[in-house]
């Protein structure tokens, strides 16, 4: 998919959603993106996909794991390798944009700028011509906050 899927916004991108659905069906799943808006090197992404599928066939991932893959949009010969990464982080999105033809409609603003793009992140890997492979889990529960939310809910007089 030519939609960029790097950073914490990944969890609601269509390719990640598709991979989650595949995992719910019991299938090993990969969310794959060519990290560019121009998308010139689909052959590179295809070659990387073949390598990853062959590896999954030999050594399957844990049931509750999907991998989010971002491939730099460059020739295969320029790829520096494949790295296991974590999701980077972005600043908040740009403000919404009012539709010029229908002022009652608004468009979601552009993605925020990279906030955490340091070594080990998907952003850093792709910027340095590495394929980024980020393991994702389906359970989004923020376990350390369960007690705090429980205490917060006690303040509701219901």
Give the location of each predicted region.
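Buried hydrophobic packing segments
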Residues: 18-19, 52
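Short glycine-/acidic-enriched loop or helix-start segments at secondary-structure transitions
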Residues: 9, 41, 143
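Charged helix-capping and loop-helix junction motifs
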Residues: 12-17, 48
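Glycine-rich phosphate/pyrophosphate-binding loops
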Residues: 19-45
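Single conserved hydrophobic/aromatic residue that forms the stacking wall/gate
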Residues: 1-8, 12
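Short, contiguous, pocket-lining structural segments
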Residues: 14, 41, 125
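Electrostatically charged, flexible surface regions
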Residues: 44-158
């Amino acid at each position: 998919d030519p939609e960029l899927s790097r950073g914490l916004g990944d969890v609601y991108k269509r390719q990640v959603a598709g991979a989650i659905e595949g995992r719910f069906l019991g299938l090993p799943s990969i969310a794959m993106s060519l990290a560019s808006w121009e998308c010139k090197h689909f052959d590179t992404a295809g070659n990387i996909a073949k390598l990853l599928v062959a590896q999954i066939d030999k050594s399957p991932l844990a049931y509750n794991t999907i991998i989010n893959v971002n491939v730099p949009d460059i020739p295969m010969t320029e790829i520096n390798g494949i790295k296991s990464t974590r999701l980077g982080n972005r600043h908040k999105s740009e403000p919404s944009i009012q539709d010029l033809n229908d002022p009652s409609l608004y468009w979601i603003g552009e993605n925020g700028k990279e906030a955490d793009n340091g070594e080990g992140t998907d952003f850093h890997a792709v910027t340095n011509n590495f394929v980024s492979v980020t393991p994702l889990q389906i359970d989004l529960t923020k376990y350390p906050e369960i007690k705090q939310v429980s205490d917060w809910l006690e303040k509701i007089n219901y």
